[in-house]
């Protein structure tokens, strides 16, 4: 008798995706982050669902409802902090996942990569709208500043901003629609994740060498299921340490003050995972230019397949590009630091230099180093 998992219409799909899936035998722990992101998404949807049961999306009661969740709901504090810090874990895994893709040349799977870039935008939009919901000072002013950037769009800008706000300022209408979008987007993200996996399974996984691994495949289960479980346990340990010992480490103290349109916080800044993009935005003195740079700082990922000049896919055997890659990582850390600093000397010039080098490394230096390495190997024939 044939195993039911190989014959049943539904189980067959699961079998081909997670059990009998042929996987390269040499993929390292950098390939764990896909499954970790899936777990993060599940944690966020579940904790978010339970939070939504007690949250009210009204300017008068939003802040109080979050306080009520933390004080009166059974384990409400745990659910709330798991959701808030779960977002941070989500972005840590996302950045490492994208970084892995850049290092090992996974962007040559064009469809998978482009869906991934769309997913990144969707997750960023969801996180931004979620940050507005507690209706603290930083929620309100963050929403005001970021939505206001759309007014830089010529001709339709102001109308567009007022349309998004649902009035002449960030108010009740804005909060209600942000809650609606924040609720629906994770389900759209889940659908996109399925498409992401669909495209990935068309080609099969990449591996650290960047070479074709068809000759050496192993079944996903038990080898990579057990490996993924180890990764999940490590991530959950880290998340729970954060939640139970340092729940406010990554948050902003200003968000413990109810939103007040008459009082601007001294330093308006987003959550840590947006700081690199915020630094790029602020480094350009022109409003429209800043907005374009902000969008391009993420959209540049979609250009990577076209900027690949080397005859090798991975950076594993490309020392010059490796150095540039790690300079880029350090550069992003500098941008993250600058994004959280006030707009004054010397932070302004550091931010501008870091922004220039960010785009230069990706658009100019890495493609050139790819050509140089090919020449050194006499592969440019």
Curated annotation (Swiss-Prot):
Transmembrane regions: 33-53, 77-98, 113-133, 178-198, 226-246, 288-308, 320-340, 347-367
Intracellular or extracellular location(s): Mitochondrion inner membrane
Keyword ATP-binding appears in the UniProt entry: no
MF-aspect GO terms: metal ion binding; ubiquinol-cytochrome-c reductase activity
A Pfam family of this chain: Cytochrom_B_C
GO cellular component annotations of the record: mitochondrial inner membrane; respiratory chain complex III
GO BP annotations listed: mitochondrial electron transport, ubiquinol to cytochrome c
Binding site for heme b b562: 83, 182
Binding site for heme b b566: 97, 196
Membrane topology listed for this record: Multi-pass membrane protein
Cofactor note: Binds 2 heme b groups non-covalently.
Subunit structure: The cytochrome bc1 complex contains 11 subunits: 3 respiratory subunits (MT-CYB, CYC1 and UQCRFS1), 2 core proteins (UQCRC1 and UQCRC2) and 6 low-molecular weight proteins (UQCRH/QCR6, UQCRB/QCR7, UQCRQ/QCR8, UQCR10/QCR9, UQCR11/QCR10 and a cleavage product of UQCRFS1). This cytochrome bc1 complex then forms a dimer.
Cited function: Component of the ubiquinol-cytochrome c reductase complex (complex III or cytochrome b-c1 complex) that is part of the mitochondrial respiratory chain. The b-c1 complex mediates electron transfer from ubiquinol to cytochrome c. Contributes to the generation of a proton gradient across the mitochondrial membrane that is then used for ATP synthesis.
PANTHER family in UniProt: CYTOCHROME B
UniProt miscellaneous comment: Heme 1 (or BL or b562) is low-potential and absorbs at about 562 nm, and heme 2 (or BH or b566) is high-potential and absorbs at about 566 nm.
Protein family: Belongs to the cytochrome b family.
Full protein name: Cytochrome b
Species for this entry: Apodemus alpicola
Encoding gene per record: MT-CYB
């Amino acid at each position: 008798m044939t195993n039911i998992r190989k014959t049943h219409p539904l189980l067959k799909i699961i079998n081909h995706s997670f059990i009998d899936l042929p996987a390269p035998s040499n993929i390292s722990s950098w390939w764990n982050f896909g499954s970790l992101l899936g777990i993060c998404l599940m944690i966020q949807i579940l904790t978010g669902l339970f939070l939504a049961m007690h949250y009210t999306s009204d300017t008068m009661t939003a802040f109080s409802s979050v306080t009520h969740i933390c004080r009166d709901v059974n384990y409400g504090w745990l659910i709330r902090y798991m959701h808030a810090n779960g977002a941070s874990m989500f972005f840590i895994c996302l950045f490492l996942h994208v970084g892995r893709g850049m290092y090992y040349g996974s962007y040559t799977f064009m469809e998978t990569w482009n869906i991934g870039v769309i997913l990144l935008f969707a997750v960023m939009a969801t996180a931004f709208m979620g940050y507005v919901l507690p209706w603290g000072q930083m929620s309100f002013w963050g929403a005001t500043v970021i939505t206001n950037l759309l007014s830089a769009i010529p001709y339709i800008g102001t109308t567009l901003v007022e349309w998004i706000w649902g009035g002449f300022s960030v108010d009740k209408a804005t909060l209600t629609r942000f809650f609606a979008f924040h609720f629906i987007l994770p389900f759209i993200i889940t659908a996109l994740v399925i498409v992401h996996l669909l495209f990935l399974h068309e080609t099969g996984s990449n591996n650290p060498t960047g070479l074709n691994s068809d000759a050496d495949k192993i079944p996903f289960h038990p080898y990579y299921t057990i490996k993924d479980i180890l990764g999940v346990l490590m991530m959950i340990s880290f998340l729970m340490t954060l939640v139970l010992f340092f729940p406010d480490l990554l948050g902003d103290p200003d968000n413990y003050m109810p939103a007040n349109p008459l009082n601007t916080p001294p330093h308006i800044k987003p959550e840590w995972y947006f700081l690199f993009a915020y630094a790029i935005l602020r480094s350009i003195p022109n409003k429209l230019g800043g907005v374009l740079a902000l969008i391009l700082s993420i959209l540049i990922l979609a250009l990577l397949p076209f900027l690949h000049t080397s005859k090798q896919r991975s950076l594993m055997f490309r020392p010059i590009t490796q150095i540039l890659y790690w300079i880029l990582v350090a550069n992003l850390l500098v941008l993250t630091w600058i994004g959280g600093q006030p707009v004054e000397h010397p932070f302004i010039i550091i931010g501008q230099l870091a922004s220039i080098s960010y785009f230069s490394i990706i658009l100019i230096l890495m493609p050139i180093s790819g050509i140089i390495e090919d020449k050194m190997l006499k592969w440019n024939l």
